[in-house]
Amino acid sequence: MSNQIQELLKLAEKNDADAQYELAEAYRTGSGIPENLSEALRWYRAAAELGLADAQNNLGAMYLSGMGADKNPIESVYWYKKAAELSQMHAQFNLGMLYLFGNGVEKNDTEAAYWLHAAAEQGDLEAICQLGNLYQLGRGVEQNYVAAAELHTSAAIDGHIESLDKLAEYQQSIEEAALSGSVIAALCMAQKYDHGLGTSEDAAQTYAWVQWARLHGTYDEDDNQLEEWESYVTAITSEADIERGKKLLNEMRGRADEMI
């Protein structure tokens, strides 16, 4: 046992939650001490009972997977919820998924959406994607393809493959919503071409969709997002792309008229 581990053990035995957590990590990974999942579980629990959210999350994970103890989804839910209520992002996601599939707790789409939203707000890409799926399907939330598109666009920009696939899956619905006046959908289209999501980057298309949002969109939320995009495309779009964007804008008007 290394000197560092010995010091951690002394502090852990004095109810130092951080030391208990670090000791549990060492036992779980075999870092500086032989791997011992039972001891890892023991020290995670000690830190969890002192209110350390990261320890509560890891304890939930160990009970869910059966590491250091028999699998116990109910106990897993208990500790994930403790951590989630302390705003531990991974616990919020994990708890949301347990509610979604009814693992260790009664299946509840509304609770699933609540906790996935909490994790998504903190930037968890998988939570953003799964929340987008719930909006697409209308599970736990009112079905809203535009909200789904906004979430999947956000995750896809950061490289989430499933979200990129989802955008391709209902591309037509997003475009139709944009042409019908949804500013959010139009900005999703702009981001698609700005970031090259499933297509080539195209500054003219980006410009055209932002202008469409400004000229034809019905915006019932904060205007800041649209203003930021207008400033962005004005600053970076070349004269040639602006001219091409204006032609694309006329084509969009034609497609919108055909939908009436």
Language model regions located:
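Amphipathic alpha-helical protein-interaction segments enriched in hydrophobic
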Residues: 184-188, 206
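Predominantly extracellular beta-rich ligand-binding scaffolds that present long acidic/polar faces
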Residues: 190, 201-203, 210
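Terminal, low-structured helical/coil segments at or just beyond the last alpha-helical repeat
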Residues: 1-3, 11, 169, 173-180, ...
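Short helix-capping/linker turns of helical repeat alpha-solenoids
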Residues: 13-16, 29-31, 36, 49-52, ...
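The tetratricopeptide repeat
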Residues: 19, 55, 91, 127, ...
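Hydrophobic face of amphipathic alpha-helices that form TPR/SEL1-like repeat modules
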Residues: 22-29, 33, 58-65, 69, ...
